[in-house]
A protein has these predicted regions:
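A boundary/linker detector
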Residues: 1-82, 95, 172-225
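Cys/His/Pro-rich metal-binding microdomains
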Residues: 74-75, 135-139
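Histidine-centered nuclease catalytic patch
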Residues: 78-133
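Short cysteine/histidine-rich zinc-coordinating motifs and their immediately flanking basic loops
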Residues: 83-94, 148-160
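Residues immediately flanking
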Residues: 91, 140-141
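Short, compact, well-ordered microdomains
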Residues: 143-146
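Eukaryote-specific, cytoplasm-facing alpha-helical/coiled-coil scaffolding segments in long proteins
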Residues: 164-173
Length: 225
């Protein structure tokens, strides 16, 4: 979204700011692009997802996360890899499909060669830069999250690992209405959750790693003027 900007607050943290002087701009593929065809675009995204999930780097990143102490199910709490299979879920806001879409738009916006391997390499690099939000969950919980009938199981933002604001800063101008609506709806949904506060500065700390970031109130980043 081109009407979402970032700026540093008094503490030096990057925060999101909605520019009310501009309208909503949705960046789309041009009609002469092969990937403007829905079937071709979906085939591209699925292939990129497959390359990522099967890569050595992807497995190495999951190991890095689990070795750092993030090795328990974010929902069930006491379930570790020793008791049941713990999997890495992309969320709670953006899925791996979303990340491929956003990366694809970035390549297009910057007139860069578009290929599944280039997109996969960028997304894997973003994983290791801790820009991609992931949540560790048990296999059964993971299946429940992806169940299309599920409308109650939501993962708290504080349970995720990854710098959301840093990602939005890097890829500003590459989000379409669907992505921004996901962000908006998730924050709106969790505004009433009393278990955690989404609207204050967050310090995500796992062992010796500290990553501060701030999530603005929903009225500051809503997608309508």
């Amino acid at each position: 979204m081109k009407n979402v900007k970032t700026k540093k607050n008094k503490d030096g943290n990057l925060v999101l700011e909605y520019d009310k002087t501009s309208g909503m701009y949705i960046t789309l593929m041009t009609s002469d692009s092969k990937l403007s065809n829905t079937n071709e675009r979906h085939r591209f995204i699925k292939k990129t997802e497959s390359i990522i999930r099967k890569s050595i780097q992807y497995k190495a990143y999951k190991k890095k996360i689990m070795d750092s102490g993030i090795n328990m199910c974010a929902v069930l709490g006491n379930v570790t890899n020793e008791k049941a299979k713990v999997e890495m879920h992309h969320g709670p806001i953006f899925t791996l499909w979303d990340y491929v879409e956003i990366t694809l738009q970035y390549l297009y916006n910057n007139n860069l060669p578009i290929s599944t391997f280039r997109a996969a390499d960028m997304i894997l690099s973003d994983h290791f830069d801790d820009l991609i939000q992931v949540v560790m969950v048990s296999e059964s919980v993971h299946k429940a999250i992806h169940n299309p009938t599920n409308n109650t199981l939501k993962i708290p933002l504080e349970s995720a690992w990854g710098n959301l604001v840093g990602y939005l800063e890097k890829y500003k101008g590459c989000f379409d209405y669907k992505h921004f609506a996901k962000l908006n709806d998730y924050l709106e949904l969790n505004k009433t959750n009393t278990d955690f506060d989404l609207f204050k500065t967050k310090i995500t700390e796992w062992k010796d790693v500290k990553m501060p970031y701030e999530i603005l109130k929903i009225e500051d980043i809503r997608h309508r003027q």
